């Protein structure tokens, strides 16, 4: 079983040591626009899967999204620890949705 941190490390290692023919290398070679397109596609697929019955499709699509998010983080120079740190700052804090009028009525 692979956890998110080891997935991030694998993606970062692939960027540092490209392997010809790998999908990860393909994404890094194509660049940010391709990576963003894939993140958008996978996000949409997660939403659609969540609306469908059962959880197998949602599980599959969520794994795809998490992988592509890790590629995006590596491409943008963010580390897994950066994200853990940000999550740690939020721990125990109550979100004040009044500060976000764009989500108030969702």
UniProtKB/Swiss-Prot annotation:
Q: Name one GO cellular component term.
A: cytoplasm
Report the domain of life of the source organism.
Bacteria
The entry's keywords = Amino-acid biosynthesis, ATP-binding, Cytoplasm, Histidine biosynthesis, Hydrolase, Nucleotide-binding
Give the chief site where it resides: cytoplasm
Could you tell me which pathway this protein works in? Amino-acid biosynthesis; L-histidine biosynthesis; L-histidine from 5-phospho-alpha-D-ribose 1-diphosphate: step 2/9
Which cell locations does it reside in? Cytoplasm
- Report any Pfam family annotated for this entry: PRA-PH
Q: Name one GO biological process term.
A: L-histidine biosynthetic process
E.C. designation(s): 3.6.1.31
Give the catalytic activity: 1-(5-phospho-beta-D-ribosyl)-ATP + H2O = 1-(5-phospho-beta-D-ribosyl)-5'-AMP + diphosphate + H(+)
Q: Does the keyword Nucleotide-binding apply?
A: yes
What SUPFAM superfamilies has UniProt attached to this entry? all-alpha NTP pyrophosphatases
Which molecular function GO terms apply here?
ATP binding; phosphoribosyl-ATP diphosphatase activity
The text of the family note is: Belongs to the PRA-PH family.
Q: Which HAMAP family match?
A: HisE
Q: What is this protein called?
A: Phosphoribosyl-ATP pyrophosphatase
| Primary gene name | hisE
């Amino acid at each position: 079983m692979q956890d998110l941190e080891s997935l991030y490390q694998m993606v970062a290692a692939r960027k540092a040591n490209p392997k010809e023919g790998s999908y990860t290398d393909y994404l890094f070679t194509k660049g940010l626009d391709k990576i963003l397109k894939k993140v958008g596609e996978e996000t949409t697929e997660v939403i659609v899967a969540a609306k469908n019955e059962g959880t197998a499709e949602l599980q599959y699509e969520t794994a795809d999204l998490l992988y592509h998010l890790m590629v995006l983080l590596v491409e943008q120079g963010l580390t897994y620890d950066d994200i853990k740190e940000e999550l740690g700052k939020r721990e125990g804090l109550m979100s004040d949705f009044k500060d976000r009028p764009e989500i108030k009525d969702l």
